[in-house]
Amino acid sequence: MSEIDLAYLPVIGRGEQINIICAMHGIKVNSLMSNPMGEDFNKDAQAPFGTIPWMKDHSNGIELNDSMAIVQYLVTKYEGPLTPQTPEEAAIMGMYWAWCQDYYSFVLSPFHDIITGHNEPFWRNLRLTDTLAEGGKETGIKNLTTLHKSRANLLERHLEKSGNVDQFLTGSKCSYADIFLFTCVRTTQETGGFGILRDELGRDPFED
């Protein structure tokens, strides 16, 4: 069986999609809990860019320190139900995955910083600094809720136009982009911290 080491945290984030992909493609995952929530892996000392997820493939020793690189490597290296079959299919899957990445980076990640109280300026939440300074937490939540609605509506309209609104993102076949979207949606619907988004909307964030 193919086998990788995967360093992440005990949260959904960008790492859960990798676990799901590995399960669907028959890849064994050795989970390493990274600092600041674990002691198996030190991202600041061991990861090339000081971030997680980080992955090492036992078959060839390759190490990757970017979620998109990890995802595309796994579905290409180890063929399975999520492997694109044509260049066109790969491009469309990559486009939808990039939408999820933007949504995660500019909506979910700043929300996470508010939820966990990370108000000090650092590389990941600099985009929040002005908002928090000018209006505090309440303004930050309102602005991020507005951005959530805008991004979700754009995706919904595009899917309606493409005819895929009741199927998967690329049609009748589940893609690795669907896996990332699933983890993003369930994060907003089910996790306790994102109750602030549900309360601000007064509903399920992806109800419509």
Question: Model-predicted segments: where are they?
Answer:
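GST-like domain detector, emphasizing the conserved glutathione-binding G-site
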Residues: 1-138
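GST-like fold's C-terminal all-alpha helical module
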Residues: 100-207
